[in-house]
Amino acid sequence: MTFKRRNGGRNKHNRGHVNPIRCSNCGKCCPKDKAIKRFIVRNIVEQAAIRDVQEASVYEGYTLPKLYAKTQYCVSCAIHSHVVRVRSRTNRRVRTPPPRFTRRKEDTPKPGQPGQAPRPAGPGAAAAPRV
């Protein structure tokens, strides 16, 4: 029978059994080696209040502590929440991490928003308005 993945979707090589974990999203029981694990590092204080907290701090140069959280998802929750994405048969074998997208700056206008110049007329442009 053909197989989809070289590892069978698990990281259990030559172990008979691994203990289950609970999904952080839905609570489903999932083997620890099959679960999709992500380590989230965030600031304890939200971005808008960091400067206020640092100015109110007694200590000079005090670095705010971070919040470390390990989330473990079952396969269905990871796909549903776009933690991992479905890949084509050839791309499943690619082991390099996907490119990280940078956020668009807030001051650049999005296409089709007010304040943007109209599109130039071209071969695919709409016909002249009827009178």
From Swiss-Prot:
An example molecular function term from Gene Ontology annotations: structural constituent of ribosome
One GO CC annotation: cytosolic small ribosomal subunit
Annotated InterPro entries: Ribosomal_eS26, Ribosomal_eS26_CS, Ribosomal_eS26_sf
Region (Disordered): 86-131
PROSITE patterns attached to this UniProt entry: RIBOSOMAL_S26E (PS00733)
Biased composition regions of type Low complexity, renumbered to the chain: 113-131
Family to which this protein belongs: Belongs to the eukaryotic ribosomal protein eS26 family.
Name by which UniProt lists this protein: Small ribosomal subunit protein eS26y
Encoding gene (name): RPS26A
UniProt keyword list: Ribonucleoprotein, Ribosomal protein
A single BP term in Gene Ontology: translation
Residue stretches of biased makeup (Basic residues): 86-95
Domain of life: Eukaryota
Source organism per UniProt: Arabidopsis thaliana
A UniProt-annotated Pfam family: Ribosomal_S26e
